[in-house]
Amino acid sequence: MNTNIIPRPEHPQPIMKRENWQNLNGEWLFEFDFGVSGEERGLYKPEKASEYSKKITVPFCPESGLSGINYKDFIPAVWYKRTVSITKEQLENRVLLHFGAVDYACTVYVNGNKAGCHFGGYSSFVLDITDLLKIGENDLTVNARDNVRSGNQPKGKQAGLFYSSGCDYTRTTGIWQTVWLEFVPSGYIKTAKYYPDIENGSFDIELNVTRGGRLTAEAFFDGRAVGSATKEIKGRYARFTLPLAEKHLWDLGCGNLYDLKFTLETDGGTDILSSYAGLREVRIDGFKVLINGKSVFQRTVLDQGFYPDGIYTAPSDEALKRDIELSMQLGFNGARLHEKMFEPRFLYHCDKAGYLVWGEHANWGLDINRESSLLNFLPEWSETVERDFNHPSIIGWCPFNETWDQTSQAAHRILRAVYDETKRLDPTRPVIDVSGAYHEITDIYDQHDYDQNPESFGKSYAGYNGEEESFNLFFKDKQVYIPQLPFFLSEFGGIKWIPESNRCSAADNSWGYGDAPATEEEFFTRYEGLTAALLNAPNIMGFCYTQLYDVEQEVNGLYTCAREKKFADYSRIIAANRKKAAIEE
């Protein structure tokens, strides 16, 4: 196989980076398993390579054009296979096999032996495969099983019908993020967690290691050494403070980051881990959400993380950065990452840009009226919160979105349990239990409102005093208003707009919210009126406009699905977004 061409060659997790790693993206053998019989047929065995009839480009899913497969129907199971060459020197270390994400249930084999399993299509996982390897060529096989119609797994916006329709889109099966090897000594750092202290200018750091030893932590800013600490670790856990000689806060549009270097010396070798962190605090004060002690109106935009050619996977690192740049150019200061846990590389670019984001799970497709749903949801959600904890760009968590099907006491208990666990894992950020729907227990009250009339929309929010609801609810019998909390209109707008030059070729099933404006002038007037109503309300702390770009048949983006301009001049949108908010005064 030609493994010289490596798509997405950049390191997938710059916040946990070692120099000694190997990217496994590129060409793999591939086979559909429509009968889910591949294990019985022994497709995991090295000698079965000849039974793989196709080749796929990893990390792109088989539904995507970039994968080389481009198969759009339902896929219950798939198999991947490739060989990996391992040297004697590499086997003197521990060899870790990382998967950015595999949708949904994954089993990994090395040289015909089961290396491990993982459930969850959005969280990352790692396997120590050292003891299954040999010097020379090794067979690596991956099996993924996926059933978006089951009601037992989160699927996000992946369509449960054959065709994409409404706000459901093309499905993703199997590997959709980078696969890589990492070579570490037997004594190495497994996890790291940073708690910024903006008052004292320091980081409180928690580390989990495989064995005790001497740890040195160093901090740098713009290449200058600005802090260090040493710690003798007796067991497998350490907590210590890393003081900083210079204080540079991470802030909106100013992604100040400290480069961190950890050196762990043990009798099992020396491990060097590169990372970074930002000095940033999120705090609630009445109806305000404070970033570093300052009231910030969150001018966010909905970003669903879909790409025409890669589906869930960006075609390049530049494409990830481009979405952030397009948003900030329009005057947004952040995004609600919607019904998808985005890859860490995207969060890295958010960190660098000073771009606020909300982390949200892809809960759609999971029937939360079943108590068993908690078993399929919570481990994956917890893994992702732990993985992304150190990103300063994430200023809040939202595990669920619009759980309109909540009808049982089991659902209420699940929502509360997930909120409680999220707060246990991360006490430093606010948590919205369910965006736009039932609020069982939440730090911020949020709502979705797609009223397209600026006048009635404005009347709903102008008099909002935080004491009683004055706004529209989709389903009054299914939603609970909670007073005395910060108010976030986390979905609004969604104005359908197809440029006049494209209207003759627009899909018949294209849609947006409400009636589409007849002219650009009408679009801009509506946009200005809707945003002004929220910016002028003294007790509203933020909005999220739907959405940054079109996604397949949903044409309410400010750009097309290919990220092309819909308008020749965006100046009125930019001016509307940048207007000062009442709550910022």
Briefly describe each language-model feature range:
Residues V110, S202-K231, A238-F240:
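Beta-strand-rich binding/interaction modules
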Residues Y163-T172, S186-K193, R280-K294:
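Low-complexity, Pro/Ser/Thr- and charge-rich linker/hinge segments at domain boundaries
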Residues E10, P14-I15, N20, L29-G35, ...:
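Accessory beta-strand-rich segments of carbohydrate-active enzymes
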Residues A115-G116, V226, V296:
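Short hydrophobic beta-strand segments in globular cytosolic domains
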Residues W28, G112, V179, Y258, ...:
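Conserved, mostly hydrophobic/aromatic
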Residues D204, I324-E325, G334-E564, I583:
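Substrate-binding/catalytic cleft of secreted carbohydrate-active enzymes
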Residues M1-L66, N143, N147-N152, D222-R224, ...:
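Accessory carbohydrate-binding/adhesion or oligomerization-edge regions at the termini
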Residues K261-S327:
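N-terminal carbohydrate-binding accessory modules
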